[in-house]
UniProtKB/Swiss-Prot annotation:
Native organism taxonomy: Bacteria, Bacillati, Actinomycetota, Actinomycetes, Kitasatosporales
Protein name: NADH-quinone oxidoreductase subunit D 2
Principal location class: membrane
A GO MF label: quinone binding
Protein's organism: Streptomyces avermitilis (strain ATCC 31267 / DSM 46492 / JCM 5070 / NBRC 14893 / NCIMB 12804 / NRRL 8165 / MA-4680)
Function in brief: NDH-1 shuttles electrons from NADH, via FMN and iron-sulfur (Fe-S) centers, to quinones in the respiratory chain. The immediate electron acceptor for the enzyme in this species is believed to be a menaquinone. Couples the redox reaction to proton translocation (for every two electrons transferred, four hydrogen ions are translocated across the cytoplasmic membrane), and thus conserves the redox energy in a proton gradient.
Membrane topology of this protein: Peripheral membrane protein
EC number: 7.1.1.-
Cellular compartment(s): Cell membrane
Domain of life per record: Bacteria
Catalytic EC class: translocase
Length: 383
């Protein structure tokens, strides 16, 4: 019997190339917190993307149920640590609506002023960190210099650099310190004079434009499907801003100053341009609020409250145009001193869902550019 020769073909030579699963995170330089992305790759192309969230979940909504209406303000400003004042504001607006409470005019204008200054602080962080994620280290030094100056102004009035705890049900903790308005106006003017550096240093940089123009295009249909809001939605041509379309605080009287910035391209560059122009407009709104406060006569800054504050039985919904998008607060009360339920609708949670639409078909090298252009805070996603 003559021996036969057999030829074996290895599976690697006969089969088609298989997709590779790549985990980005949970700890990664391009995320503000701990976010994990599970990517399925075909070569250098992303075939499928799945954001894996929950690493910073602390059960904020459940904790609200064990705190009274004064204490929940302390919890509300922590999930998005870059928009602390705006988060406090949404909660107190919901409680005040439940109580049918009128807030003094001086408190309304001061809240509007501080909300816009907080918006500038938030945007400066991303205006500096986004170019850093694409390899440009210089802008973040400018951004943090401006933030430090503005943080001193916010710290002087509230005592806190990040978690202000300045809102109260019925108004604010206290009136503006003597001379604070003058210092705030000087800070706003200085910031405005130096914001042009981003036009020259960032938007004028051909490498930055090459990395962002036409990359990560989000369609208006996807914006509506995923509930995306804020500068990300407006960068895709969705012309909606609660401050104009459903005014709260003093925004109804600021319609001549308020400018809703939109772009039609829907790419990373459009989102960055919206953020930058929105920062300019927030400084204009802050100036308008300072002018109005200077005209107001001295008066109360808050309402007198009972020792034990109880909301009547019922439910209400309040929403605000936070720096990162729309935040909603659904409050259910059983007539007790603690909320029966307080549901948070955070902007970052909805915005990050769009990654499943944005990433497939793009290069791995563009992943960080797209991820950073969504301007999210992981604590705001996980709560």
């Amino acid at each position: 019997m003559t021996p036969t020769t057999e030829t074996m073909v290895g599976i690697g030579g006969a089969a088609e190339s298989t997709d590779m699963v790549l985990n980005i995170g949970p700890q990664h330089p391009s995320t503000h917190g701990v976010l994990r992305l599970r990517l399925v790759l075909d070569g250098e192309r992303i075939q499928h993307a799945e954001p894996v969230i929950g690493y910073m979940h602390r059960g904020a909504e459940k904790l609200f149920e064990a705190r009274d209406y004064r204490q929940i303000i302390m919890l509300a400003n922590r999930h998005d640590w870059l928009s602390a004042f705006s988060n406090e504001l949404g909660v107190v607006l919901a409680v005040e609506r439940m109580l049918g409470m009128e807030v003094p005019e001086r408190a309304v204008w001061t809240r509007t002023l501080l909300a816009e200054l907080n918006r500038v602080l938030n945007h400066l962080m991303f205006l500096g960190s986004y170019p850093l994620e694409l390899g440009g280290i210089t802008p973040i030094f400018y951004a943090f210099t401006e933030r430090e100056e503005l943080q001193h102004v916010m710290e002087e009035i509230s005592g806190g650099r990040m978690h202000y705890m300045f809102n109260r049900v019925g108004g604010l903790k206290e009136d503006l310190p003597a001379g604070w308005a003058t210092r705030a106006r000087a800070c706003v003017a200085a910031l405005r004079s130096r914001l042009d550096v981003y036009d020259d240093l960032v938007l004028g940089n051909e490498i930055f434009r090459g990395r962002t123009r036409g990359v990560g295009v989000l369609t208006p249909e996807a914006v509506h499907a995923y509930g995306v809001s804020g500068p990300i939605a407006r960068g895709s041509g969705v012309d909606f801003d609660l401050r104009r379309d459903e005014p709260y605080l003093a925004y109804g009287e600021l319609q001549d100053t308020l400018k809703v910035v939109t772009r039609q391209e829907g790419d990373c560059l459009a989102r960055f341009e919206c953020l930058l122009e929105q920062t300019h407009n927030a400084l204009d709104l802050a100036d308008a609020c300072l002018d109005r406060l200077a005209e107001l006569p001295p008066g109360p800054i808050n309402q007198r409250l009972p020792k034990v504050l109880k909301a009547p039985e019922g439910h209400t919904y309040a929403w605000t145009e936070n720096p990162l998008g729309i935040n909603g607060y659904y409050l259910v009360s059983k007539g007790e001193k603690t909320p029966y339920r307080l549901k948070l609708r955070s902007a970052s949670f909805n915005n990050i869902q769009a990654l499943t639409e944005l990433l497939p078909g793009t290069l791995v090298a563009d992943m960080v550019a797209i991820l950073g252009s969504l301007f999210f805070v992981v604590g705001d996603i996980d709560k």
